[in-house]
């Protein structure tokens, strides 16, 4: 009986297997080969292997792949490294080990000299972070299968697709145009980004293999793109950020209604190369009106003199300045609700001045006569917002307590009995008004019970203590209710703080309004003082350099290429037997920065005492009188003296008598 067709089919790799293989291989063979950024991994729990070292991996690829073009020996040497060896030996079956070696070879062969493309990066989609991209190294013809740009395809279920989308790892998902099934492709082909007018397309070579074929001619330095799907970036790709949509100002690049689109191009920013000199005062005035996105500054000057001293001086001056209005010092409710950002800085608390005996006595008498309240004296003006508590001096508090004990009645019955009904009504009205206008500071600064108990017993004996009545008097009851309400409000606030905060998770963050070219020459990437936008002297691309005290001559892509192949980008190998260009394999012997003259020219500085170039010297010689070097001048003088006995002025030379023969 003939075997069934399903039995002859090879078992496909699962999503977990392909993700594990691809993560460690991109980490070892891309990130650790002079790559200036990192490739996004498929698993959030992946951590780079400690056994993968950049010098070791780069040396193997340069010796075995770039120079010898031997993939078998490169594969064997790579599997002897600590990181890859540990992962390879951890695989259980021979089938898994064979699949891992095949996937390893897909990444190794991209470093062959005949590979027409290379892995680069772009910040078009997120501005602040770089993602992998594919750039052509030579011209590619139409309908040409792009060599070594291949991968493996894995069909995923809807549940797996939802899990990948929730983790924001759906950057390699494609939808088949025939079967309409969703699949995830891994390998070097996953570095190709999406474009609505792509210059290449994905093709299936086997039941799991894919390759990329050019649909139109591709020039050197152009990004190789494919089409992911019609509705991959929302409905009708309404959130697409590709180059075609940027040029046509559509989808995510579409400007808002009522706004004029501003094309932030590189040519526009560099067209204003020459301008008249202006004073620094004019620059400071007109600097606020300049938009960084319209006229970007490649090397902004950020002063490093913003020290702690200036900040502290500004804070102390703002605190101590007495000329500020009272309304400007009032804090809003939002400011009071949130804690300060710098809790280490303590606010300076003022001390209440010591009130004299006569003034305190007068204020206490008036307060006791008008209101009849026992609680406290209102001695400070009313303020709308609470201020920090101020601790009074002990002497002042004792004096106030003495005066209160002498003048203010203790028993509410005695006060009620001694007063007439008119006085009672006036006391009630004045008490209510005083309670309404009482500030929080006055309530908080009540004398403590310990201070009252510490008074001499002789003074305490003079006061007759009367037990409180069963029915409380109106002013006392009003004050107690007011305090209880405040305490209840504080208790409610404390309870509210203890409640857990509810966080509403958003599936997608709010879309940011993008403008064409906002990812180039943008100040968002210049987060440090010595960061600058630099233009590569080889490929004319712009890149951000950190610690740009000395300007680099090449971009990270050109530097990586020269370190691996020993030639200037995009050359990878000798053109023929007559090619005499030197191949420098030790990248440490190459000076990667600009010379002093070019450095001054880039920074728009004058070259004081700088040596002129050969072309400038040749032009000066042709325009002016002939110049001679030291050796040339000596030779010229010697020849003239030998030919004639005249001086340069025309007079005859006199020979010294010591040199004459006797």
Swiss-Prot record:
Gene Ontology BP terms: methylation
Basic residues composition bias: residue spans: 647-656
Enzyme class: transferase
PROSITE patterns given in the database record: SAM_MT43_SUVAR420_1, SET
PANTHER family listed in its UniProt record: HISTONE-LYSINE N-METHYLTRANSFERASE KMT5B (PTHR12977:SF4), SUPPRESSOR OF VARIEGATION 4-20-RELATED (PTHR12977)
Family per record: Belongs to the class V-like SAM-binding methyltransferase superfamily. Histone-lysine methyltransferase family. Suvar4-20 subfamily.
UniProt name for this protein: Histone-lysine N-methyltransferase SET9
């Amino acid at each position: 009986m003939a075997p069934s067709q399903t039995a002859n089919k090879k078992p496909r790799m699962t999503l977990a297997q392909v993700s594990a293989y691809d993560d460690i291989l991109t980490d070892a063979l891309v990130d650790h080969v002079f790559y200036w950024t990192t490739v996004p991994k498929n698993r959030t729990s992946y951590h780079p292997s400690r056994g993968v070292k950049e010098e070791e991996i780069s040396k193997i690829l340069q010796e075995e792949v770039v120079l010898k073009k031997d993939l078998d020996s490169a594969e064997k040497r790579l599997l002897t490294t600590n990181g890859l060896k540990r992962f390879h030996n951890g695989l259980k079956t021979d089938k898994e080990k064979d699949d891992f070696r095949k996937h390893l070879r897909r990444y190794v062969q991209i470093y062959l000299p005949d590979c027409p493309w290379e892995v680069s990066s772009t910040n078009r989609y997120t501005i602040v972070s770089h993602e992998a991209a594919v750039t052509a190294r030579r011209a590619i013809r139409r309908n040409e299968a792009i060599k070594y740009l291949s991968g493996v395809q894995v069909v995923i279920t809807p549940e797996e697709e939802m899990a990948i989308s929730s983790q924001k790892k759906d950057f390699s998902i494609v939808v088949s145009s025939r079967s309409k099934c969703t699949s995830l492709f891994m390998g070097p082909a996953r570095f190709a980004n999406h474009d609505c007018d792509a210059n290449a397309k994905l093709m299936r070579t086997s039941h799991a293999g894919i390759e990329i074929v050019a649909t139109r001619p591709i020039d050197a330095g152009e990004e190789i793109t494919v089409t992911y799907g019609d509705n991959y970036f929302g409905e009708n790709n309404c959130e697409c950020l590709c180059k075609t949509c940027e040029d046509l100002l559509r989808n995510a690049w579409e400007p808002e209604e009522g706004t004029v689109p501003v094309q932030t191009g590189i040519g526009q920013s560099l067209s204003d190369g020459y301008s008249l000199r202006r004073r620094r005062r004019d620059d400071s005035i007109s600097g606020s009106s300049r938009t960084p996105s319209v006229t970007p500054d490649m090397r902004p000057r950020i002063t490093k003199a913003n020290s702690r001293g200036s900040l502290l001086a500004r804070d102390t001056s703002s605190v101590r300045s007495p000329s500020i209005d009272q309304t400007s010092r009032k804090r809003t409710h939002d400011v009071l609700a949130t804690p300060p950002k710098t809790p280490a800085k303590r606010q300076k608390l003022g001390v209440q001045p010591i009130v004299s005996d006569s003034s305190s006595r007068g204020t206490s008498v008036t307060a006791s006569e008008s209101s009849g309240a026992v609680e406290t004296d209102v001695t400070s003006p009313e303020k709308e917002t609470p201020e920090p508590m101020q601790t009074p001096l002990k002497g002042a508090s004792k004096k106030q307590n003495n005066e209160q004990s002498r003048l203010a009645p203790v028993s509410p019955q005695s006060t009620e009995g001694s007063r007439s009904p008119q006085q009672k009504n006036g006391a009630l009205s004045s008490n209510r008004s005083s309670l309404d206008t009482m500030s929080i500071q006055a309530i908080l600064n009540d004398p403590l019970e310990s201070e009252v108990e510490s008074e001499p017993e002789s003074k305490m004996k003079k006061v007759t203590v009367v037990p409180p009545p069963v029915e409380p008097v109106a002013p006392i009851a009003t004050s107690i209710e007011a305090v209880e309400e405040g305490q209840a409000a504080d208790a409610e606030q404390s309870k509210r703080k203890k409640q857990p905060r509810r966080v509403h998770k958003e599936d997608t963050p709010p879309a940011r309004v993008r403008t064409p070219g906002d990812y180039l020459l943008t100040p968002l990437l210049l987060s440090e003082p010595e960061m600058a936008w630099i233009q590569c002297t080889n490929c004319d691309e712009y890149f951000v350099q950190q610690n740009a005290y000395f300007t680099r001559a090449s971009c990270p892509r050109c530097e990586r290429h020269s370190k691996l192949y020993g030639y200037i980008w995009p050359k990878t190998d000798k053109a023929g037997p007559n090619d005499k260009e030197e191949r420098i394999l030790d990248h440490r012997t190459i000076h990667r920065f600009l010379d002093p003259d070019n450095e001054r020219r880039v920074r728009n500085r004058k070259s004081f005492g700088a040596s002129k170039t050969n072309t400038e010297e040749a032009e000066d010689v042709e325009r002016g009188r002939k110049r001679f070097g030291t050796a040339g001048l000596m030779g010229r003088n010697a020849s003239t003296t030998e030919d004639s006995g005249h001086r340069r002025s025309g007079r005859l030379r006199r020979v010294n008598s010591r040199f004459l023969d006797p």
